[in-house]
């Protein structure tokens, strides 16, 4: 990965994942879920529509430039209204399982996409199992589409699945923005992610997250409703107004974004206040520079004047040794060095006991000069004080150290012997007093210097303490955020466990209901089988009764003979009619009448041959006629049975003897009519006289 945040080759796994994954906007996913719930999930025809809508999420996401940073591809960015537009990766395992489950659904059993309401109605018995274009229940009582949509909606509620800045940088090792030769300060990514998390949490608390607001209720389109058509999460001012209106509390204040953070939208008043403060800061800085430059120039001139006096003093040639006409002893330290780099108390001279001076060659008369070392240290103290007042202490301190090295040559020059002796006298008392006053001045300056150093050290300690407090606050904020994240995960785990327990209970109740339904079906099947067995037994019993009610073989033979004779007589009569022609119709009638009279005489003869006793005899005659009629009827039945037996054989005769109830009635009525036509009942005999 280069310094600009781009990718080197196509072999980078993070780059391939970043390019090939399915990135979808949160509001689009929620809109598809809302439309799917608005449709009838129990209809098999709606399954293809829902699958197409879910498959289209994130399919066309690209900007035709693969070598870009995540921020350029805006998986999470800000709109012109200052609101968050969030993206999720549908290729993550949490979403990939759900998308794969939905994409593999089929309507083969017309049950994969059945809704829970249909399932309850079917199990409770209020609704029969549907077929055709509607969906019923499957064997394992699983309603995959309903459960998948519910799981997808629940996954969108988790903040851990949102791709924030720190998630891109930590998980995929991708820089959020192209790095222009420098890296962002540590903690900027975490701060930006914390702002985004706080924004999302506030939106969920105010019920202004995609899918929570009333605008989503009943929304059946694939694009978001009007308040969400340009952003996913509303701006902070809308969220704060909603929280204040609901009297919830916990308002979110927009934190100023850093140079590498998210560009939060600010109001015009805040921008004007920032501009005013900037101009005020610039003015104060210019004023401080002017005062500092003036003070530094003043003390610089003062320092130059002091150095000029020293130069004039060093350049005086009063004696042959070039020592300036002074002959005195310098009260030095044990090391015989002079150092102005530490404290001025080291250079304080003790009270001189015997100092000599040479009168100056002036018109005003003799003048007693101060000791040379006291005068030099006095001037150096003034120079040191000027350096401290001009805030150039640490800078000029090195210069003073160099000056000390040059001053050693001057000390050697002063220690050289002077040829002109006897010109010095003892110093008066005033000289000692001035020396003591100089000593007090040196001590005062030394105390002030120590106080300045202590103030500087105190300021350093305060700065270090403030830095430690800031680090402690940052660590506390990070620990609180981690604690809140852990609590949220624990709550999510608890909710998932509750859902799992509820699902297990529902499955158990459904299993009990299905077992009861199966038991009911088994009982119904047993009742049906018992009814079938009873029907078959009744049928066999009826067949046995029919077989037992059949006429005997002798009766069948008599009836067959009578019927054959009747058919032969009829055939002979028809043949005679055909031979005689159309004019012999009367003869045919007469022959028929003769046949009828012959049968009547036969009947009468049979009736007369039986003994009669007054009324009882007539009754027996009627009974004989009725028995003859039954004989004819039995003969007709035997005729039908005989005709069938000739075709099917004697073995299966009784199995094919049964006919329909209507045909049996018709056969009996026809046989009775024939018997009444063929048999004429005789007139009852008259009672004997007397």
From Swiss-Prot:
Domain of life: Viruses
Pfam families per record: TMV_coat
Molecular function terms, GO-annotated: structural molecule activity
BP terms from Gene Ontology: viral translational frameshifting
Gene3D superfamilies per UniProt: Tobacco mosaic virus-like, coat protein
Residues covered by region (Disordered): 583-628
A GO cellular component annotation in the UniProt record: helical viral capsid
Keywords: Capsid protein, Coiled coil, Helical capsid protein, Virion
Residue ranges of the motif Involved in virus transmission by the vector: 553-556
Ranges in a coiled coil: 451-509
Misc: This protein is translated as a fusion protein by episodic readthrough of the termination codon at the end of the capsid protein. Readthrough of the terminator codon TAG occurs between the codons for Gln-188 and Gln-190 in about 10% of translation events, thereby producing the 75 kDa readthrough protein.
Record-stated family: Belongs to the virgaviridae capsid protein family.
Protein's recorded name: Capsid readthrough protein
Biological source species: Beet necrotic yellow vein virus (isolate Japan/S) (BNYVV)
